[in-house]
Design a protein with these regions (language model features):
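A cross-family phosphate/adenosyl-ligand binding-site feature
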Residues: 1-175
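Short amphipathic alpha-helical interaction/tethering modules
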Residues: 1-14, 174-242
């Protein structure tokens, strides 16, 4: 078995990643903890959590780890995807369906995007869950690399409307968060021409989709033009004339 196979959990493994963005004051909220516990113990799912390091003092780290069923606290990730493959302690849980907890600045979009790009680099679907976190932009979603929702039990109407305009679903309970993540990990809802352009800029030749993904006609035009292929999480790859 190659290093890559060992890293992603073996040749037959189909690992998936949920990237949770936890706003500082939501770290200890019961709904957030329960959502992370459910997602972190879902077979075949690796949970990576981003939060500001100042938000989690040592005593809360221990309490948080116990609440979510165990996790590893690490520093911010390196930017090079190749370096991430061997970065100790961060993605080791991918092989064991465990839980990884990464500390970073809560608004560090570059770090979040690196996590999403790493998942795409390894061929893993990714879902992005915000817990009390209201994004001002969603570049990783515009690139077609994941689906997003926010767990916000007390979201008020105007804020909810703005989030929905960004294509971000509002979730109210841990159960809704778990159900959403399982659906989202099947792949993006729609792949359009702009997403294909984003893949091309990053030098990717394959576009990962799920069984329920809609590929627009303009996206097919781009795929043919760029000589790219579609690939599902089930490892099926097909030519565009099939």
């Amino acid at each position: 078995m190659s290093t890559h196979d060992r890293f992603i959990g073996g040749c037959d493994a189909k690992p998936r990643v949920v990237l949770a963005l936890v706003q500082d004051h939501y770290v200890g909220v019961a709904e957030g903890l329960e959502s992370l516990r459910q997602l972190g113990t879902t077979p075949g799912v690796t949970l990576v959590v981003w939060s500001a390091s100042s938000a989690i003092p040592r005593d809360l780290q221990d309490r948080f780890a116990m609440a979510v069923g165990g996790c590893t606290f690490v520093e911010a990730l390196p930017g090079d995807p190749e370096a991430l493959l061997t970065y100790q302690g961060v993605y080791v849980p991918i092989a064991s369906n465990g839980l990884a907890f990464a500390l970073s600045e809560g608004d560090d979009r570059d770090a979040m995007e690196r996590t999403v790009l790493l998942a795409a680099f390894l061929g893993m679907p990714v879902a992005i869950l915000g817990i009390g976190w209201e994004p001002n932009s969603n570049p990783w979603l515009q690139a077609g690399l994941g689906r997003a929702a926010t767990l916000w039990p007390d979201a008020w109407r105007m804020r909810s409307q703005r989030l929905r305009q960004l294509g971000i679903e509002i979730l109210r309970t841990p159960e809704q968060a778990t159900d959403w993540a399982r659906r989202a990990l099947d792949g993006p809802r729609v792949v359009d021409a702009a997403m294909i352009d984003g893949y091309l800029r990053r030098g990717q030749r394959e576009v990962l989709v799920g069984v329920h993904t809609i590929v627009t006609p303009s996206a097919y035009v781009r795929l043919r033009e760029y000589g790219m292929t579609l690939k599902t999480s089930a490892e099926k790859t097909w030519k565009l004339d099939e």
